[in-house]
């Protein structure tokens, strides 16, 4: 009977820990104020648009503040890379969320962004539009503050966009950056050389976001994300989320179930692109909030 009682106690403890983690992640901001501050919609109304090529094909989707005059600051640029077979609408909740905080987001419609070329080109397009008098973006963008952000294959593309364009990209954020074993092994992925990425070569600060989910255990495990984090010589953060939207977080959850990611993912960009001192406390100082959050076990900063 003692063995049975011990097993029951262990099971109950595990369940309570899981419930605590899930509750803490949505705990009304009393325990994790930075996460709470940026998890809800931002203060600015948003709108959307598209960029088309000469043939009329939509090449980028845009998510941006509806009234730049209301911001009181120049809008930093975020350029997004989809996961394999993905499209911007998959991550629209997250991308629109960023726009509500005053970021101008450009997202390639390509399902194959692993080379980083489309990601960098999107940032270059917006930087050029800032100087075009007839553009809605004219004079409103901070072209010196640009983040490359992506999911899975697009995460690799974000790293490549940054390492290949250090004068353009100033910060990076990745979601489930795959183990390099997978480079070139799946349909629509670039050939090995074209899609190879090396976070250790970054000169920009980076936030690696991973999960404890079963898909990521194969594609982008916590050990993989930790190894990427340790390889960098720049200011970096590693966030390993357990639950999002009261479900176990996994590989594409930033697109399919992003609620739990929004706070720290937005805070990193607020910190790195706008110098937000409140957002910075999640990642810096003697007690970074990210490291104390029970819904993000195994996280690290340096």
Regions found by a protein language model. Name each.
Residues 68-74, 117-156, 163-164:
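Gly/Ser-rich "nucleophile elbow"/oxyanion-hole loop immediately N-terminal to the catalytic nucleophile
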Residues 72-83:
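Short beta-strand element of the alpha/beta-hydrolase
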Residues 244-302:
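Alpha/beta-hydrolase-fold serine-hydrolase catalytic core, especially in secreted/extracellular enzymes
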Residues 167-255:
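The feature captures the conserved acid-bearing segment of alpha/beta-hydrolase catalytic domains
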Residues 1-10:
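Bacterial N-terminal signal peptides that target proteins for export
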Residues 26-73:
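N-terminal cap/lid segment of alpha/beta-hydrolase-fold proteins
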Residues 89-107:
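Short amphipathic alpha-helix adjacent to the substrate-entry channel of hydrolases
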Residues 10-20:
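Bacterial N-terminal signal peptides
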């Amino acid at each position: 009977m003692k063995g049975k009682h011990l097993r029951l106690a262990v099971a109950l403890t595990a369940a309570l820990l899981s419930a605590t983690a899930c509750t803490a992640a949505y705990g009304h901001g009393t325990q994790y104020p930075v996460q709470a501050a940026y998890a809800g919609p931002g203060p600015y109304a948003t709108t959307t648009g598209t960029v088309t090529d000469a043939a009329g094909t939509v090449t980028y989707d845009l998510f941006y503040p509806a009234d730049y005059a209301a911001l009181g600051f120049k809008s930093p640029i975020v350029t997004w890379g989809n996961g394999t077979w993905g499209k911007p609408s998959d991550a629209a909740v997250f991308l629109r969320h960023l726009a509500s905080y005053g970021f101008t987001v450009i997202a390639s419609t390509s399902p194959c962004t692993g080379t980083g070329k489309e990601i960098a080109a999107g940032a270059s397009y917006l930087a050029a539009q800032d100087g075009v008098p007839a553009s809605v973006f004219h004079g409103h963008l901070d072209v010196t503050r640009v983040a490359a952000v992506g999911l899975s294959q697009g995460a690799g593309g974000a790293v490549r966009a940054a390492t290949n364009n250090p004068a353009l990209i100033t910060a990076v954020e990745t979601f489930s950056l795959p183990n390099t074993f997978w480079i070139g092994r799946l349909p629509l992925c670039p050939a090995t050389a074209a899609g190879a990425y090396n976070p250790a070569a970054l000169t920009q600060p980076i936030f690696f976001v991973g999960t404890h989910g079963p898909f990521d255990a194969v594609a982008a495990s916590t050990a993989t994300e930790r190894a990427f984090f340790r390889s960098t010589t720049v200011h970096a953060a590693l966030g390993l989320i357990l639950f999002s939207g009261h479900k176990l977080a996994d590989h594409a959850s930033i697109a399919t179930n992003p609620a739990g990611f929004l706070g720290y993912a937005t805070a990193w960009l607020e910190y790195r692109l706008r110098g937000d001192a409140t957002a910075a406390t999640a990642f810096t100082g003697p007690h970074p909030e990210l490291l104390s959050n029970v819904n993000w076990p195994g996280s690290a900063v340096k």
